[in-house]
Amino acid sequence: MKKTFIFILWSLFSVAVNAQNFNDYFEDKTLRVDYIFTGNATKQEIYLDELSSLPKWAGRKHHLAELPLAGNGEITMKDKATGKTIYRTSFSSLFQEWVSEEEANRIKKGFENSFLLPYPKKEAIVTISLKDVYHKVNASLTHEIVPNDILIHQRGTNLSLIHISEPTRRRGIS
């Protein structure tokens, strides 16, 4: 009985120690990352297209470093200073389905893909990888996110910044 109690107490403690607080690493904003997946049946490549900032984060705020589902692609975000994984997610893309088609043996194509990630407070390293049906990585790209980079486009609207005036005043009508 004593061993069971100690084991349960130790388990609860280890879960609490490993729990990650969303606000420690992320702003309440969304980072939209646009990639282009290109290639054919034998070779695939990933290119970073654009980074955008959106006003709110509507995704999960718990179990951020855990992979929720298995897919044929994966995105991992790590804190640059510590190397700690702070966010992971998986996906399946139309490009990876197309690669298995007969057409992919004859021509190369590119597919646009957009992913929504929590907006990091500090510099982060993002790795995106595409996997085959055996979960072997076919292509990957690692790039840095600098949160205050002027090349991250501001998108969406923050309703608190919008000023709504009376229509009659704008037209000069009394």
Summary of predicted features, one role per range:
Residues 77-79, 130-132, 166:
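Residue-level signal for short segments within beta-strands and strand-turn junctions
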Residues 162-174:
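Single conserved hydrophobic/aromatic residue that forms the stacking wall/gate
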Residues 10-13, 72, 173:
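Intrinsically disordered, low-complexity segments enriched in Ser/Pro/Gly/Ala and basic residues
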Residues 39, 81, 121-123, 132-134, ...:
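Residues that cap or initiate secondary-structure elements
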Residues 1-22:
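Bacterial Sec-dependent N-terminal signal peptides
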Residues 107-161:
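Extended acidic/polar, glycine-enriched regions
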Residues 8, 64-66, 104, 117, ...:
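Residues embedded in well-ordered secondary-structure elements
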Residues 20-113:
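N-terminal prosegments of processed precursors
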